[in-house]
Amino acid sequence: MVDAAIRGTLPAGTGTNASQRGTIAMVAGEASGDLLASLMLGGLKARLGDTVSYAGIGGKRMMTEGFVSQWPMETLSVNGYVEVLGSLREILATRRAIRDSLLANPPLCFIGVDAPDFNFGLEVPLRRAGIPVVHFVSPSIWAWRGGRIRTIARAVDHILCLFPFEPEIYAKAGIPATYVGHPLADVIPMVPDVAGARAALDLPAGCRVVAVLPGSRQSEVRNLGATFFAAMARMHRMDPNLAFVLPAASAPLRAIVEELHQQYPELRLTIVDGNSHQAMEAADVVLLASGTATLEAALYKKPMVISYKVPWLTAQIMKRQGYLPYVGLPNILSGRFVVPELLQDDATPEALARETLLQLNDQGNIAFLYEHFTRMHETLKCNTAQLAADVVVDLMRSRGLV
């Protein structure tokens, strides 16, 4: 059950009186959503100034933008069908608490940021109560069989799509959708500053650098961490001149990776707090868990190896749901495999080490990926924060709320 100490209420909304200060409520469920939402907050603040406050569930980056997180984001940072069962009671209690708070004090608008399983269940009753609802980040309805789109139709007034092929899918279902590009494409430089990133992280000079990102959730790091470290050890034996950099998204994750590092003291490893962008910018190649980080690596124009491991039952459910043949965003956006994916039983230390070194040493492939990912970057760079803010403000204005 959610602790009483975190059952705060959100600041009251403004109703229809534009002269009063109002609240836009937002919920982000993990580190990637926190990053995306923080960038969106910048666009909203530019449009609305200080007439509106922002509250709900968010992380450190959102709070840096003035967001008030009434519940801990870590409650929602659980992934996978089996893994979520241990936290299900707390997750559902949190959703009931924020739902009741928002219905008692209606915000100007509710913005769900990714976390579709949590947010759609929250958005349906909020929209039914007349609260404008925008969902930022389309779920993978193009990867799953299409039953999910019926839930989306009940849940949202508008959906903001990160990728150019998505709005057409929603148009066929009669759901308002706008392609806004990806905010990371606006903030990641078109030309990476590799030397600057290495200097900032104080990485060893004269070494080729492998960035290692086993995930931003504890479940991910526990599933992949040992395998990744064993792969790093094999790479070190094959090329002792390699340096590794691993960004830990939180203090608990840092503790896990530091414990793993003790088993492989020979590794030339730099563990950094967060700062995944700089770690990838500094790298020659990236070994990482499937997720938003794969797109970040592509925007930094890096060769990479994508991996993922989930419990057997979770994997079987995912297979039955009809996933695409690839899970990494660079491959999905390309419509083909441009970087290797090693999943489940294929994600052995031997295979990960071999594929990562192949990616590191294939100069022709490195040149191809740099050009290919540059074109992808140009497509996704759309001034997302402004476009997304425009949709939200226009929706509120159509209801006479601002």
Curated annotation (Swiss-Prot):
Pathway: Bacterial outer membrane biogenesis; LPS lipid A biosynthesis
Keywords per UniProt: Glycosyltransferase, Lipid A biosynthesis, Lipid biosynthesis, Lipid metabolism, Transferase
Gene Ontology cellular component terms for the protein in this record: membrane
Broad EC category: transferase
Keyword presence, Glycosyltransferase: yes
Record-listed E.C. numbers: 2.4.1.182
Reaction(s) catalysed (UniProt annotation): a lipid X + a UDP-2-N,3-O-bis[(3R)-3-hydroxyacyl]-alpha-D-glucosamine = a lipid A disaccharide + UDP + H(+)
Sequence similarity: Belongs to the LpxB family.
Pfam families, per database record: LpxB
UniProt function note: Condensation of UDP-2,3-diacylglucosamine and 2,3-diacylglucosamine-1-phosphate to form lipid A disaccharide, a precursor of lipid A, a phosphorylated glycolipid that anchors the lipopolysaccharide to the outer membrane of the cell.
Domain of life: Bacteria
Species whose genome carries this gene: Cupriavidus pinatubonensis (strain JMP 134 / LMG 1197) (Cupriavidus necator (strain JMP 134))
GO terms, molecular function: lipid-A-disaccharide synthase activity; phospholipid binding
GO biological process: lipid A biosynthetic process
Presence of keyword Cell cycle: no
Disulfide bonds: none
Name recorded for this polypeptide: Lipid-A-disaccharide synthase
UniProt cross-references to InterPro entries, sorted A to Z: Glyco_trans_19 (IPR003835)
